[in-house]
């Protein structure tokens, strides 16, 4: 892939694939696993003429597991969205949430099919004895913005607590520092 003239591919603070996709992945990891003990990251510029991160591989170290956050502009074809491996089996999910593409196609959020995925996009749970398709739960980005508007108007709670947002930002910056320094960094310094 070629470098394109857009904000995330230009050098500077907050640019690159890690700052574009990373916050979403970090948020999901923090929601599922909490704050890690340490982080090891490699944020790289692999494309010719690239001045902003276009490939990242981040390990979040927890007491009983490691979480891998990975993104690359080189990934072609069907990409793994989630892969969870545990003692009871493995879960694999390909593809992206359908909401953005549906919105571009003119489908409105109040449509019953808004965030529903077809069976081909379901995740698969593999155990020692079975292989089972797991339907994706329906979501709605618009709920976040409704909650945010209510919080701004003073009539509701923010969809994300300030402390959670600050922890996410600190972890993103710590991962970038880990990559720059070439070593694992403890998360004790973040909120």
What are these regions (language model features)?
Residues 23, 70-78:
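Glycine-rich phosphate/pyrophosphate-binding beta-alpha loops
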Residues 25-26, 141-146, 172:
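A general structural signal for well-ordered alpha-helical segments in protein cores
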Residues 35, 63-66, 78, 89-90, ...:
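Short acidic/polar mixed-charge low-complexity motifs
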Residues 39-42, 70, 188:
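Solvent-exposed beta-strand sheet faces enriched in polar/charged residues
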């Amino acid at each position: 892939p070629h470098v394109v003239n857009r904000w995330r591919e230009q050098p500077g603070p907050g640019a690159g694939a890690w700052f574009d996709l990373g916050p979403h992945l970090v948020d999901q990891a923090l929601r599922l696993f909490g704050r890690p003990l340490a982080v090891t990251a490699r944020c790289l510029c692999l494309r010719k003429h690239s001045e902003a991160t276009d490939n990242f591989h981040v390990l979040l170290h927890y007491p009983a597991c490691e979480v891998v956050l990975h993104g690359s502009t080189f990934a072609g074809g069907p990409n793994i969205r989630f892969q969870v491996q545990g003692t009871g089996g493995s879960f694999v999910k390909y593809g992206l949430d359908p909401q953005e593409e549906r919105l571009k196609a003119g489908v409105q959020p109040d449509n019953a099919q808004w965030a529903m995925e077809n069976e081909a996009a379901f995740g698969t749970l593999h155990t020692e004895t079975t292989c089972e398709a797991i339907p994706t739960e329906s979501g709605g980005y618009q709920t976040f913005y409704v909650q945010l508007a209510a919080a701004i108007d003073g009539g509701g709670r923010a969809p994300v607590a300030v402390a959670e947002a600050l922890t996410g930002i600190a972890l993103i910056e710590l991962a970038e520092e880990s990559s720059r320094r070439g070593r694992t960094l403890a998360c004790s310094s973040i909120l």
